[in-house]
């Protein structure tokens, strides 16, 4: 009997083991099915296949088994699955480590996770999980040491149930949408070493009870959270702390001196808050400190002398504060300092001349202070210096010779000082330099004959004393976008070679002693947006072919001796908003119609032999001109008429033939149920249905037979018969995007020549039409603010909730469309890189954005990122406030951002109220001033010159949707 019992027990154990093995295999296969969404590739987890082998699942990629073939670790990383995590995860009840990260998984977490009682590591970071985080799933996870939910879409309050995890060492809920306060109970994690709650929407005060976390080494609470109050002084008692970050968190008050007790701290990041007072000298007790960032606050006073004890410092960021006094001499003695950025303060006196002598400097920026004396000579002793920026100070003397051979340099900016002497010639041959700004100084001498640099995108030498000829070797600067040589003493002719530069967008050589004619090659530089040759001694005529400059916005050749007739082809240059031909020797009659309707008489003043059609002095000239050409016209008309008749016959034949062919060739690809056919869409491509034209193509309104209205965008230069540059795959990705503030892509119709995108129809047109047309007066401030919030939410979705993120590349008021309820929808996202016209130059097709909206760094990097979109959105906010277009209304070469900065300088007593009152849209009869000021300040944050200093779109949404209480009051009339 005893033997039978043992036998049955052994049989039962064997059955249980076999069942568990089969159960693990079955669970993995079901997990694969649920995690693979419709967008997943067929080869995702391709080795996860059914097998009769008891241990087959142990060889699956990312699977680790114990000696009993039970799954104890599952790691599915960076597999684009796009599905969800199913309840079968709970059947893998021997799991000790679960890592499912960067897989684009969506939905809520299954409660069956609570069955994983052996789990030590739970990592679900970098996915799209949503809903409240189910804290009760952790009740049975008594062994859990690491919980990482970073970068998901969780919302609601932070879960308090997890405080029962007494072995927890690592906790990250960063990068989500958690709201409410930080629970006091989080101080009960006795073994917690890392706590990351940054990048959420948390409010309230930072609990001082967090000081009870005596094992804590890293604490990150900032970015997008908006706490009330300041930094709890009690945090200074966490002696184990090595990394403390509470940036961009709405902190107020002063920096607690008690933080100086954190002797093991190596990184302190408190930037982008509202901290005031002085920098506590007690911080010098943090002898391990390597990185100190207190930038973008309201700190005052001087840099404490006691900081000389911080020998391990590698980074000092104090920029955008109100610090004063001198930059202490000991800064130059810090042996490990790599980054010194103290721009936009009130520092004065002379810089320590030993700065950089430690041989470690990489980033150096002291812009916008009151510094004097000479620039330190050894800044590039390290041979690693990347940024050398000293603009807007009172430096004198030459640029140190050590800058010339500094091959690591990427940015040289010394404008607006009193520097003089010749420029070290090596500067113009640096291989990595992207920007050289020497303007508004007293530099002299000639430019070197040989200039090179594949990375140089911005060369600005304006308002100096340079002489000699402009080197033809500038043709070697293949990345050059901006060339500013105005207000110097250059002579000779304009080198024709310059206009062979493939991405040159702006050239200003006004105010020199240049002679000769305008090079004919200028008409071949199709990327040009602004040309200024004014105030020279140029002769000859404006070259033919100007209409080739399709994106030219500014053309100024005033105050020269240019002669001949004004080219009639200018009438077709629809992008040209500023034309100045004044004070030359032009003759004949000013053309009319077309783009000439945009210009006023000042554009042509000072040309004695030039007349306007409406002037009586032109009557006889017009009569003689018409009579002398009458016979010639008769012959031409006859030839044209005969040719036209022939062309009509041929065209009608071809149209019939093509129509029969096209009816078979069009294909409709729908991203949702559409109750119309491709042929119905094509039938709407008529002149009378056009509702918009732009760089992206022509937009038609299409009314389908079932009563549906759609917007049909006919893209330029794209068809399925050509190399589609990933077009189909990308468009299908865009078609899956769903957000109430994103204009929905319904589908597309295509043949071998053309792609037609089908969008929701927006009956109220674009924001640009309402702001800059006759309708502008009907947009109240409340409506403008609402549109700003909705457009920001749409962009935020593209940047933060799409994987991979989508960069719009062409944010502007004309790409923000309004539905019947005036709700804003972001349009044309992700299309800019596909607008390739095979008939245009590559430089043309690569331009990202619209003139006036393009971020300044694009000029020298030729790259866009999400911060480029943020800059463009900031311009849109300024449009909403000011009611004016971003360019064309502020004078030659001045955009809306430059105009605001100029206006601020001209104010007698500058203040936010005075500046906003000076620039606000006069059509707004009444508005809450504090609300306008609030949005204005957000806009100015977005258009900061340096991309990293701009907020993210998440931060913009948070700021716009959480204004101070006072912004809803104070309605005034001005």
From Swiss-Prot:
Changing residue 575 to R: In sunn-2; dramatic increase in root nodule number when infected by Sinorhizobium meliloti, and inhibition of root growth in both the presence and absence of rhizobia. Disruption phenotype: Dramatic increase in root nodule number when inoculated with Sinorhizobium meliloti. Inhibition of root growth in both the presence and absence of rhizobia. Increase in arbuscular mycorrhizal (AM) fungus colonization intensity in roots (hypermycorrhizal phenotype) when inoculated with AM fungi. The keyword Transferase applies. GO terms for biological process: cell differentiation. GO terms for cellular component: membrane; plasma membrane. Keywords: ATP-binding, Cell membrane, Differentiation, Glycoprotein, Growth regulation, Kinase, Leucine-rich repeat, Membrane, Nucleotide-binding, Receptor, Repeat, Serine/threonine-protein kinase, Signal, Transferase, Transmembrane, Transmembrane helix. InterPro entries: Kinase-like_dom_sf, Leu-rich_rpt, Leu-rich_rpt_typical-subtyp, LRR_dom_sf, LRR_N_plant-typ, Plant_LRR-RLKs, Prot_kinase_dom, Ser/Thr_kinase_AS. Glycans are attached at residues 75, 104, 123, 136, 250, 274, 312, 346, 508, 513, 556, 585. The active site is at 810 (proton acceptor). GO terms for molecular function: ATP binding; protein serine kinase activity; protein serine/threonine kinase activity; receptor serine/threonine kinase binding. The chain crosses the membrane at residues 635-655. Residues 685-972 form the Protein kinase domain. Its main location: membrane. ATP binds at residues 691-699, 713. It is found in: Cell membrane. It is a single-pass type I membrane protein. Its EC number is 2.7.11.1. It holds the Pfam family Pkinase. It comes from the Eukaryota. It is an enzyme of class 2 (transferase). Belongs to the protein kinase superfamily. Ser/Thr protein kinase family. This is Leucine-rich repeat receptor-like kinase protein SUNN. It comes from Medicago truncatula. The lineage of its organism: Eukaryota, Viridiplantae, Streptophyta, Embryophyta, Tracheophyta.
């Amino acid at each position: 009997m005893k033997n039978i019992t043992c036998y049955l027990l052994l049989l039962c154990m064997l059955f249980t083991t076999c069942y568990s093995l089969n159960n693990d295999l079955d669970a993995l296969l079901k997990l694969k099915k649920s995690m693979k969404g419709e967008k997943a590739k067929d080869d995702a987890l391709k080795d996860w296949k059914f097998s009769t082998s008891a241990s087959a699942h142990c060889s699956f990629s990312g699977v680790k088994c114990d000696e009993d073939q039970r799954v104890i670790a599952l790691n599915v990383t960076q597999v684009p699955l796009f599905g969800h995590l199913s309840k079968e995860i709970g059947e893998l009840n021997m799991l000790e480590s679960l890592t499912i990260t960067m897989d684009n998984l969506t939905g809520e977490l299954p409660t069956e996770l609570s069955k994983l009682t052996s789990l030590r590591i739970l990592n679900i970071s970098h996915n799209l999980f949503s809903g409240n985080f189910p804290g009760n799933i952790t009740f049975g996870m008594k062994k859990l040491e690491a919980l990482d939910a970073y970068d998901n879409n969780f919302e609601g309050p932070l879960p308090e149930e997890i405080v029962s995890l007494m072995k927890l060492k690592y906790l990250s809920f960063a990068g989500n949408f958690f709201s409410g306060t930080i629970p006091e109970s989080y101080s009960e994690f006795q073994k917690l070493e890392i706590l990351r709650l940054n990048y959420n929407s948390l409010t309230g005060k930072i609990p001082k009870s967090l000081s009870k976390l005596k094992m804590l080494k890293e604490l990150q609470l900032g970015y997008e959270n908006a706490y009330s109050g300041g930094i709890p002084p009690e945090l200074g008692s966490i002696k184990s702390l090595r990394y403390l970050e509470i940036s961009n968190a709405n902190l107020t008050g002063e920096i607690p001196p008690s933080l100086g007790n954190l002797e093991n701290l190596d990184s302190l990041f408190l930037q982008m808050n509202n901290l005031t007072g002085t920098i506590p000298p007690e911080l010098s007790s943090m002898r391990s400190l390597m990185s100190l960032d207190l930038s973008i606050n309201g700190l005052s006073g001087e840099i404490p002398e006691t900081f000389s004890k911080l020998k391990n410092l590698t980074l000092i960021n104090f920029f955008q504060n109100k610090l004063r006094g001198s930059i202490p001499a000991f800064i130059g003695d810090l042996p490990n300092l790599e980054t010194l950025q103290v721009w936009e303060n009130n520092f004065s006196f002379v810089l320590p001349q030993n700065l950089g002598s430690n041989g470690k400097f990489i980033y150096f920026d002291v812009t916008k202070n009151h510094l004097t004396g000479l620039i330190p000579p050894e800044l590039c002793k390290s041979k690693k210096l990347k940024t050398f920026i000293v603009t807007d100070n009172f430096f004198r003397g030459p640029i140190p010779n050590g800058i010339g051979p500094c091959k690591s340099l990427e940015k040289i900016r010394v404008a607006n000082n009193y520097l003089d002497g010749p420029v070290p010639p090596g500067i113009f041959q640096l291989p990595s330099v992207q920007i050289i700004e020497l303007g508004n100084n007293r530099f002299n001498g000639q430019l070197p004959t040989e200039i090179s640099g594949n990375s140089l995108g911005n060369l600005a030498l304006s308002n100096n004393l340079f002489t000699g000829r402009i080197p033809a070797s500038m043709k070697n600067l293949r990345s050059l976008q901006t060339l500013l040589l105005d207000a110097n003493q250059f002579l000779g002719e304009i080198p024709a070679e310059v206009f062979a530069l493939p991405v040159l967008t702006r050239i200003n050589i006004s105010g020199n002693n240049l002679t000769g004619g305008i090079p004919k090659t200028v008409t071949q530089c199709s990327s040009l947006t602004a040309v200024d040759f004014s105030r020279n001694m140029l002769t000859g005529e404006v070259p033919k072919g100007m209409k080739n400059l399709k994106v030219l916005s500014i053309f100024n050749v005033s105050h020269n001796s240019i002669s001949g007739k004004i080219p009639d082809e200018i009438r077709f240059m629809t992008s040209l908003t500023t034309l100045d031909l004044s004070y030359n020797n032009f003759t004949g009659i000013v053309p009319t119609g077309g783009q000439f309707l945009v210009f006023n008489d000042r554009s042509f003043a000072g040309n004695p032999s030039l007349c306007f059609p409406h002037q009586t002095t032109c009557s006889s000239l017009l009569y003689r001109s018409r009579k002398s050409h009458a016979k010639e016209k008769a012959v031409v008309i006859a030839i044209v008429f005969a040719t036209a008749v022939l062309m009509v016959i041929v065209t009608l034949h071809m149209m019939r033939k093509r129509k029969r062919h096209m009816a078979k060739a069009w294909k409709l690809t729908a991203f949702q149920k559409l109750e119309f056919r491709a042929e119905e869409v094509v039938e709407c491509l008529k002149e009378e249905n056009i509702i918009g034209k732009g760089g992206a193509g022509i937009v038609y309104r299409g009314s389908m037979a079932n009563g549906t209205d759609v917007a049909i965008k006919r893209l330029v230069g794209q068809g399925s018969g050509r190399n589609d540059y990933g077009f189909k795959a990308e468009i299908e990705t865009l078609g899956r995007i769903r957000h109430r503030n994103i204009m929905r892509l319904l589908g597309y119709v295509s043949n071998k020549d053309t792609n037609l995108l089908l969008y929701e129809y927006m009956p109220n047109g674009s924001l640009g039409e309402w702001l800059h047309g006759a309708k502008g007066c009907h947009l109240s401030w409340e409506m403008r603010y609402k549109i700003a919030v909705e457009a920001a939410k749409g962009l935020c979705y593209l940047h933060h909730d799409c994987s991979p993120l989508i960069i719009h590349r062409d944010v502007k008021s004309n790409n923000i469309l309004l539905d019947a309820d005036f709700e804003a929808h972001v349009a044309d996202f992700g299309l800019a890189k596909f607008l390739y016209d095979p008939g245009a130059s590559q430089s043309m097709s690569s331009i990202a954005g619209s003139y006036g909206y393009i971020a300044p760094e694009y000029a020298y990097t030729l790259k866009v990122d999400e911060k480029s979109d943020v800059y463009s959105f900031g311009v849109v906010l300024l449009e909403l406030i000011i009611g004016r277009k971003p360019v064309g209304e502020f004078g030659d070469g001045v955009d809306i951002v430059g105009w605001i900065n100029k206006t601020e300088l001209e104010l007698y007593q500058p203040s936010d109220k005075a500046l906003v009152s000076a620039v606000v849209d006069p059509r707004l009869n009444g508005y809450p001033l504090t609300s306008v000021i609030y949005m204005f300040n957000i806009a100015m944050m977005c258009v900061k010159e340096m991309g990293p200093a701009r907020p993210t779109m998440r931060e913009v949404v948070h700021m716009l949707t959480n204004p101070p209480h006072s912004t809803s009051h104070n309605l005034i009339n001005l």
